[in-house]
């Protein structure tokens, strides 16, 4: 499993490490599983980042690719039950997945005795309830158990003690969908694409103020400038591109000086950015980046599970502080306070919700400071 690619979820955690950990883990006896025999495969299909739609398109176009990948994962790690945790706003994907699952059962590709092998794997779809925080794996597991979606403290990791207290693989749709391709072509063929530790291809989603939005699959190593100018053909408005946000609503705003950075996990980390799920949102020269920074704080206020104070309170105070800066009130002191708040959120939050919210805020503050001098207070 060492040749397995990095996951295609926001954290890009190596899928092979998760699988190996679950394979080696010993299930624990619980009230639900007194014999301690169960392991799980969970697909995170709660695609909630703004500007992302690759998961939805794949599930609607080829649900069997996801089913096959999850079945292989189950057989590989010794799991007999899988769940697809699907975003509730995807009714078409929900219908098509259930049709595909029924056909897979009828053809004996999943069930009690897969193709006469004596191996079992069962798979079901479960709908989320619309909470962005349930894209975080431990919140997802809480929701899947029928509880309020709230972040769990780690350790224990889900691979050791996940769904219903049992060893659980939690992978993204694109990660699991790539499994059959890797097995068919071989790890060497898959790793021939890309650069550094970023191997294979990435489903890049172009959105925002872009002339040609949509989904493109490219090998790692392509630059943002190539993606936006060559594939996206610039802005829809015709105005110059001012900023590019990569990695969803918690991604940094990148100015033109950083657009030649290759699409690579390590290269992005060096400039304080992240690739995330591959969503790219384009802003033209009319965009108010201070308003976008405030929106990031507002988004965190609305979507925080509320479990940890840095996220729950920090985002509220962050939005208030941005308003004060834009109103010209004690600008120097409030700017320092905003940076301190961001540092507390980054260092003290339990999960990426609060930990990454400072990314768009600080990048806007550092790269587009002139927008924070505006006397207009953004109201959201």
Residue locations for each model-derived region?
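Accessory "access/gating" subregions that flank catalytic or transport cores
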Residues: 1-28, 32, 192, 197, ...
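Conserved phosphate/anionic-ligand binding catalytic regions in large, soluble enzymes, centered on
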Residues: 2-22, 73, 130-142, 146-148, ...
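Hydrophobic alpha-helical positions that pack around
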Residues: 37, 94-220, 232
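Extended active-site and interfacial segments that coordinate phosphate-rich ligands
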Residues: 20-51, 55-69, 141-168
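Short acidic, glycine/serine/threonine-rich loops at helix termini
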Residues: 11-19, 52-55, 94-99, 134-146, ...
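Glycine-rich phosphate/pyrophosphate-binding loops
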Residues: 64-67, 71-88, 236-242, 315
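Short amphipathic, charge-patterned alpha-helical segments
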Residues: 69-73, 219-237
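Ferredoxin-type iron-sulfur electron-transfer modules in oxidoreductases and energy-metabolism complexes
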Residues: 26-29, 37-39, 45, 54-59, ...
């Amino acid at each position: 499993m060492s040749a397995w690619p990095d996951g295609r979820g926001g954290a890009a955690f190596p899928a092979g490490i998760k699988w190996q950990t679950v394979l080696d883990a010993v299930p624990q006896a619980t009230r639900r599983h007194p014999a301690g025999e169960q392991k799980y495969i969970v697909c995170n299909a709660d695609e909630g980042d703004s500007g992302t739609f690759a998961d939805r398109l794949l599930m609607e176009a080829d649900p069997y690719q996801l089913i096959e990948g999850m079945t292989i994962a189950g057989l590989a790690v010794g799991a007999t039950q899988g769940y697809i945790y699907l975003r509730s706003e995807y009714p078409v994907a929900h219908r098509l997945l259930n049709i595909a699952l029924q056909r897979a059962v009828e053809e004996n590709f999943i069930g009690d005795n897969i193709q006469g092998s004596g191996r079992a794997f069962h798979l079901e779809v479960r709908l989320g309830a619309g909470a962005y925080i349930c894209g975080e794996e431990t919140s997802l597991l809480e929701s899947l158990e029928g509880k309020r979606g709230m972040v769990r403290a780690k350790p224990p990791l889900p691979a050791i003690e996940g769904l219903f207290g049992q060893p659980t693989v939690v992978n993204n749709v694109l990660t699991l969908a790539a499994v059959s391709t890797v097995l068919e072509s071989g790890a060497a063929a898959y790793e021939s694409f890309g650069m550094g530790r970023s191997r294979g291809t990435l489903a890049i989603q172009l959105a925002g103020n872009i002339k040609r939005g949509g989904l493109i699959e490219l090998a790692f190593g392509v630059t943002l400038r190539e993606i936006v100018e060559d594939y996206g053909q610039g802005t829809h408005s015709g105005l110059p591109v001012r900023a590019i946000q990569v990695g969803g609503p918690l991604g940094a705003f990148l100015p033109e000086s950083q657009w030649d950075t290759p699409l690579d996990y390590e290269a992005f980390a060096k400039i304080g950015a992240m690739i995330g799920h591959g969503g790219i949102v384009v802003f033209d020269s009319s965009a108010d980046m201070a308003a976008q920074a405030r929106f990031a704080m507002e988004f965190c206020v609305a979507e925080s599970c509320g479990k940890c104070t840095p996220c729950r309170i920090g985002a509220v105070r962050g939005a208030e502080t941005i308003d004060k800066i834009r109103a010209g009130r004690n600008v120097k002191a409030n700017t320092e306070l905003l940076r301190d708040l961001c540092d507390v959120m980054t260092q003290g939050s339990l999960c990426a919700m609060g930990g990454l919210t400072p990314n768009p805020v600080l990048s806007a503050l550092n790269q587009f400071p002139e927008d924070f001098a505006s006397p207009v207070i953004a109201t959201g």
